[in-house]
Amino acid sequence: MNPTRNAMSWEELAIHAANPIDQINGLNNPYSSLRLFNKSESEAIVTLYRDNHAWCPYCQKVWIWLELKKIPYRIKKVTMRCYGDKERWYLRKVPSGMLPAIEIENHVITESDEILFVLEEIYGPLGQSLNETKVLEHRRLERELFSSWCNWLCRNSLFPAQEQKKKEDFKYVARKLENELQKNTSGGRTPITTKNGTQPGSADIVFILYIERMNASLAYYKGYSLREEHPFINTWLRNLEELDEYRGTQGDFHTHAHDLPPQMGGCFTYSNSS
């Protein structure tokens, strides 16, 4: 019988540790307090106030936008109200406590769409503007999909037919999204062509926040695989997951399954065992 090996020392373990990431100029990551993209720190006139744990979908929307546009910015983290008390310093700056917020040259803006409108004015849109006709149509579709998901996930069904109706309503809207995705051979919704190929645009950013959460929550609470049931959505998600800008913000299934109930007021499974 071989003798038990002594545990490795910290010095020995350090040899096997991964090199520390460059949080400022490297890949997108949730730990940064400053992002420069190899530009001067003097260009970082935007400060993003987001939640501590990268759980807030609307913070994620602004975060991805800044990363895709490579806009230098600073990050300050704040507690979401459904998980604890707001920091007093933040309430002095934003009395409502709303997240996300950005600060540009002492001007504070809240509401994720309003933030993106301001950023578009300064830095230009990500592909098509949020106010362009087609993007407005996509934004309405996203709200329709969100509503059908909430109705299925967050409202308890009293009998099987009610549960099935909610499921079919969600599938109907999800297929409408798939029909839109099929129109774009690149797999994106509002892509912009760059020297490196096709990148997502404004409507992609609007959709990804809650589709990421739908994918996790419906699997966990309803046993419904969004990606298997909707292959065009799956392709679109795969394309986004190849991007470091998105992947650095992406939450895992366990996180979303358990961070959503406090935010949404509850998530319900359905059992017909009775």
Question: Model-flagged regions — what are they?
Answer:
Residues 195-222, 232-234, 240:
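GST superfamily/GST-like fold recognition
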Residues 159-165, 219-228:
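Acidic, serine/threonine/proline-rich low-complexity intrinsically disordered regions
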Residues 1-196, 267:
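GST-like domain detector, emphasizing the conserved glutathione-binding G-site
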Residues 244-274:
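Long, charge-rich low-complexity segments
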Residues 78-84, 193-196, 224-228, 253-259:
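Short amphipathic alpha-helical segments embedded in low-complexity Lys/Glu-rich regions
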Residues 93-95, 233-235, 261-269:
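Short alpha-helix boundary/capping motifs
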Residues 183-188, 215-220, 246-249:
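Substrate-binding/catalytic groove segments of enzymes
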Residues 165-173, 227-242:
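Extended, well-ordered alpha-helical scaffold segments
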